[in-house]
């Protein structure tokens, strides 16, 4: 029986990214290689954080986050075995904080998905915030 261990060189580390990978793919760790494999034998990698925090995310609703990421094609797609999934959404609107796991077929793809998701999420949040302020200003006239 192989158990996964995640080394977090910080306080408060979690196994959420590994558990998300397991739940999304029904894959497993291969004891011989140490790689996470899908049921069809494809290796998957992830990059994750439980502390994506930015002032631009404050006031954003979880449905807005999903819309922004889905419109950019960065949500997790089981057919492509790549994309981002989110947790800690209860902290999003009030604190501008969330957790995210980005999955790819190798380290480079997981990192590229992660970086693209952060970039698009922050840009989309800024655009939505600006549009909301414009609506408030128009309503006040």
Q: Regions from the language model: what does each represent?
A:
Residues 1-141:
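ATP-dependent carboxylate activation and anion-phosphoryl transfer catalytic cores
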């Amino acid at each position: 029986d192989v158990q996964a261990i995640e080394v977090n060189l910080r306080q408060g580390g979690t196994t959420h990214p590994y558990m998300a990978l397991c739940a999304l793919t029904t894959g497993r760790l291969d004891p011989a290689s140490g790689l996470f494999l899908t049921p069809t034998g494809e290796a998957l990698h992830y990059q994750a954080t439980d502390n994506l925090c930015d002032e631009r995310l404050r006031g954003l609703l979880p449905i807005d986050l999903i819309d922004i990421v889905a419109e950019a094609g960065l949500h997790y797609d089981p057919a492509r075995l790549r994309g981002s999934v989110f947790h800690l959404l209860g902290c999003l609107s009030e604190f501008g904080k969330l957790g995210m796991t980005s999955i790819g077929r190798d380290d480079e793809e997981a990192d590229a998905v992660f970086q693209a998701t952060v970039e698009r999420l922050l840009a989309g949040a800024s655009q939505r915030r600006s549009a909301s302020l414009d609506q408030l200003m128009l309503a006040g006239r």
